[in-house]
């Protein structure tokens, strides 16, 4: 992972059950020179994260509602348990984040580092990622 004000290169894992979102995020993030791996189920992503000795991911971006039985929030908890604490987790959701305490509790506990309300414009997502990593390293 290298940091400069204008060029952050991260290892990012993206998990979403919607192929268009996976493709869009893959293209967007690779276009910013990030290394990206995508999964369409939380269970596959978790298996990948826990079954190999990988260079740790810098960031996991996961959808909240996933059909595989493991929600994005459950995946976030497991990521924090099984990977280095330096791995950040962004939870994406189409739900109103103010409608439930579950989201604010996840932020307070450190289970997730950011909650991203969908849809999010590409430039805003990039800004959130850059702000999170630049702030963390200063």
What feature does the model see in each segment?
Residues 19-37:
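Two-component/phosphorelay signaling modules centered on CheY-like receiver
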Residues 38-59:
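Acidic, metal-coordinating helix/loop segments flanking the phosphotransfer/catalytic sites
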